[in-house]
Amino acid sequence: QPKNEVIVELADGWFNPAPLKLFGKYNLRETLTIGEPQVIADIYMKFADREMIIGSDADWQYCEGAYTFNNIYLGERLDMKLFRGDNTTDLLMPDWKNVVLSNGPEGRLVSSFIPKINHTLSLGAEHIHVVDEETFIIDFGAIITGFIDLSITASENQRVELLYSEDVDENYELNTDSTLAGFVGKQVTEGVIIDGGIGAPARAEQKDAFECRSGKNHFINAFTCHSFRYVQLSGINIEQLNNVQALSVHTVLRENGGFYCSDPYINKLFEVAKRTKLNNIHSVFGDCARERFAYGGDIVALARSQVYQFDSAAIYKKTIFDFINDIRPCGGVTETAPFMGIKTNGVGGETGPLGWQLVLPYLIAIHYRHYGNVNLLAESLPFLEKQILSLEMRDFDDLVTCCLGDWGSRVHDMRNYKNGSPALHFTSACFYYYHLLIIAKICDDLGFKEKWLKYIGKANKIREKILSLYKNTDGSFADRSQTSFVFAIYFDLCDDIESSLNALIDLIKKEQNVITCGIFGQSFAYEIFHRYGHNELILEWLRVEAGFKKMLKNDASTLKEFFGDNLNGSNNHAMFSSYSSWLFQALGGITVAEEAVGADVILISPSFTDTINFVDCWHQTIRGRIECRWRRYKKGIELVIKVPFNLKKCTLKLPKVYQLNKQLPAPIDCDTYHHFYDITDAGEIKVLL
């Protein structure tokens, strides 16, 4: 009878991290659940006449493997001489010993329910730069997060080292600053170099290494994802290289939205947002390779754009659970989930800043709007109520200091890293107001009228406080920055919306069409400028040389962390990719309405901007596919819309300037500039405007 073996190869991962001090102070071993690599397994076997389960127990054995080192940030080291072929578990001389039983970590073991991480794209070498006889640099043409797949011919004991980078300098030398784990080894300001602690490398670069056997050697990462466009190989000459590819690896999320228009640059922006997002999704919404943490603030800023581009039902649910699982004893939500020690300007008790704590109620609300899971809504409410109680423990004047504000703003005061965001206290107060508005709506959605009255009452009191403290005599707010105007308009705090919009537009024009807001302000700006019909301004912003075009110079295919020089930023960071929601909602015209439950209320409101000649847009909801396509012809604009028949409500919003000549039924409503048409049961319509 054939013999069957099951071999599990273990790595350190997040469970056995190196004692590396990220940013010079955060040691993951002090905050995460840690231990020696271990396994729990049940093997299910089904025969013709019976079923059998074999579980991991004291009869299992272990041995040392072929990997001599692995770390999620720093890389892998492998000895090719210890195994046969390409199978690192097919060891030549395994020394099997009885396993040691462990109680394992605390908590409840839950089966994974999200899409898995997989290889989705392969890139070949676009250029090879030879440094010397035993060193060369490969350019793959685009930044990916993933693995190297390398085949070489080598001699016995030949050592090959790989160094990864997102960038090169003017001398074509690798510039690894943007991927140094936790800035370790980077000079962040003059005379200040981040120290990673005892045993840490001088520079926490992304590196792999392997010892060769004589003949063919095949190396492919197993335990470390790198963020890179360039890789430097040392220890071999170029003639020994047989094949090399960069493999993009990420959680495989199904695309549920597409966008294409007449402007190739706008199409590139759409693809860049998609690629940068995926590069940083590995079971959690990570920020960049330097940290790989799920920051609540980043998730909030990108939540709308994410849900239009990808099927996010499962991974949003997991993210909600992740933040709930790490709620602190006081009821507050952490800055990242899992919590790993960072709590910059937090509310206290290891909790995160106000805007970052918004991730829990905001994601729950977005999930309900798009996916309609009422059970998730009900199960989450007690945690949201405890969160509100934890926020109420702080005096209002103290609470509004507990945030990082509109992070990433161009007008951030770099001399005051933690408190330099524009209109900091005002935006913090708005975040608190938003917490209360969201929980009130959730209570209303669940039919809890008394709780709705309670929280909407609290929200109204905070609104009055905001108006009394931060409203200026001229109707503006706080420091009169772009951020302050955007927040005031988004949260409907202005007496005269039109006047405030014009003042904001004037500020943007004075900056040569540059929107200086940070990640929250930009996300909100895309919403308000579409809502109030100023979409041409957003196109001007997206096209301005000092904005995304500068980010994408030198054939860049991913977004950077910051605008400007990006001195201390990543070159593979998605936090400013929220514009993709505007492409869907404004140019593409497809919006899942605020009052929707499981995407059952849809607004079709395309913006026929003068500089765009056609748009093809689609979005797959849980109720079916929605399409909105429009094209300019000499005789007018042809608009084609397809909607499923199972919607509660679908409204078409069109400017009054267009004559429909009875192509649609009479409008059901109108405002100053638009007619509104009920197309709930239309299925497919085609009109000429």
Q: Where are the regions that the model predicts?
A:
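Amphipathic, well-ordered alpha-helical segments in soluble domains
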Residues: D298, T319, W356-L363, H435-I438, ...
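Non-catalytic C-terminal accessory modules of carbohydrate-active enzymes
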Residues: R29-M45, M52-T88, S111-I117, L121, ...
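C-terminal capping/lid segments that line or modulate ligand- or cofactor-binding pockets
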Residues: R77-D79, R84-G85, E291, G296, ...
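Helix-terminus loop motifs that line ligand-binding clefts
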Residues: Y172-A200, A313-M414, A546-G564
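Active-site acid/base region of carbohydrate-active enzymes
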Residues: L28, Q240-E271, K277, V284-T336, ...
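Extracellular/oxidizing-compartment recognition motifs
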Residues: Q1-C288, G297, A314-T319, T334-G348, ...
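Alpha-helical support elements that line or immediately flank enzyme active sites
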Residues: F147-E166, F223, S234, G297-D326, ...
